[in-house]
From Swiss-Prot:
EC number(s) on file: 2.1.1.-
Native source species: Saccharomyces cerevisiae (strain ATCC 204508 / S288c)
Miscellaneous comment text of the record: Present with 1550 molecules/cell in log phase SD medium.
Protein name according to UniProt: Protein-lysine N-methyltransferase EFM3
Protein's UniProt keywords contain Transferase: yes
Name of the encoding gene: EFM3
Length: 339
């Protein structure tokens, strides 16, 4: 394990037990800079003091494993004794209890060395205020992982722009925390002209989504045009200039499937849009069958592109790299096109 990966694990809230296993099995002895270690631990404490406390205790209890994985060097003006720092930190955090379920955290998800997404979320909250968009769900992480390994420009045809470059206009439906759109923008910003990031909850769009895009605001040349807006399926019209639709965990509620499928059909009726990609956690086969039936009624073809059921490597990678625990149910990615 190198130093960058170690900090990425901390900012993604990797459980201490799993982090310890990675340190113990690390075959390299990488350099760890004491001054950076202190800065990173302070950042972790600032956003999640209880998690910081559990990591500090784990490192103190297994000092020899930490020492085996890293060679600690002092590169600042003042020499820092790491274990003295950890001991003092643990004493300060001793009274810190488990966080309230409503507590917000800023989690930084690592999809690869170059794509790391910060998300402000409430990870212990399933739903509130009639929305499930306050936390990042497994299907969104799986979709992000899929898009990292399957080049966006190979997934959908693109239209030539006036400057001769070929770029996509992408629509995300049911964006929630916005992590799928953020992955696309970080990984493929040079291939994206316009990104519509939408959700049916106006309040969520104006608060949660806006906040997460602010957290990941990196100024680049020729930055895509990003639009955060409400899209209520069956009521609001879809943008007419889109090439690709993406969505994650939007098929969980059977009562909204007719409106969702109508929205997808409206998108695919546009001249430019040829493909919708949806990731779905398979909590109920009956809901999946209903989704397929609704698609069929509207002349849409629904095909499984990949699934954790059929590809053990996908499941292992998604579990180990993105959430560090078994999946609650299989996840599939569907391709929806016109029949």
């Amino acid at each position: 394990m190198n130093e960058d990966l170690f900090y990425d694990r901390l900012h993604q809230r990797c459980p201490g037990k799993y982090l310890l296993e990675e340190l113990e099995t690390s075959k390299s002895n990488d350099v760890l800079h004491a001054s950076r270690f202190v800065c990173e631990m302070e950042l972790v404490q600032k956003t999640n003091a209880y998690y910081c406390k559990t990591i500090v205790k784990m490192l103190l209890d297994h000092e020899w494993i930490f020492a085996k994985a890293f060679t600690i060097v002092n590169d600042g003006e003042d020499e820092i004794e790491i274990y003295d720092y950890l001991y003092e930190k643990y004493i300060k955090l001793l009274s810190t209890g488990k966080p309230d379920p409503m507590m917000k955290d800023v989690v930084r998800y690592r999809f690869d060395e170059d794509v790391k997404i910060k998300i402000e979320e409430t990870p212990n909250l399933i739903s509130a205020a009639s929305t499930t968009g306050f936390r990042t769900w497994e299907a969104a992480l799986y979709m992000g992982d899929f898009l990292i390994h399957k080049p966006l420009q190979e997934l959908a045809p693109v239209q030539g722009q006036d400057d001769g470059k070929k770029k996509l206009n992408v629509l995300e439906v049911g964006a929630g925390t916005g992590i799928v759109s953020l992955v696309i923008l970080q990984k493929y910003h040079e291939f994206v002209n316009k990104m519509y990031v939408t959700d049916g909850d106006s309040n969520l769009v104006e608060t949660q989504l806006k906040r997460n895009f602010e957290l990941n605001n990196e100024v680049r040349e020729n930055e895509p045009d990003i639009k955060l807006q409400r899209l209520w399926w069956g009521s609001d019209r879809v943008p007419e200039d889109i090439d690709l639709v993406v969505g994650a965990d939007v098929t969980y509620d059977p009562t909204i499937l007719p409106d969702l499928c109508e929205c997808l059909a409206e998108c695919l009726a546009l001249d430019r849009c040829k493909l919708c990609l949806l990731s779905a956690t398979i909590r109920s086969e009956s809901t999946v069958q209903l989704f397929s039936q609704e698609c069929n009624k509207l002349g849409l073809k629904c095909t499984i592109v990949t699934s954790t059921e059929y590809d053990a490597n996908n499941e292992i990678r998604a579990m180990k790299a993105l959430q560090f625990k078994p999946l609650i149910a299989p996840i599939r990615i569907y391709k929806i096109t016109k029949q």
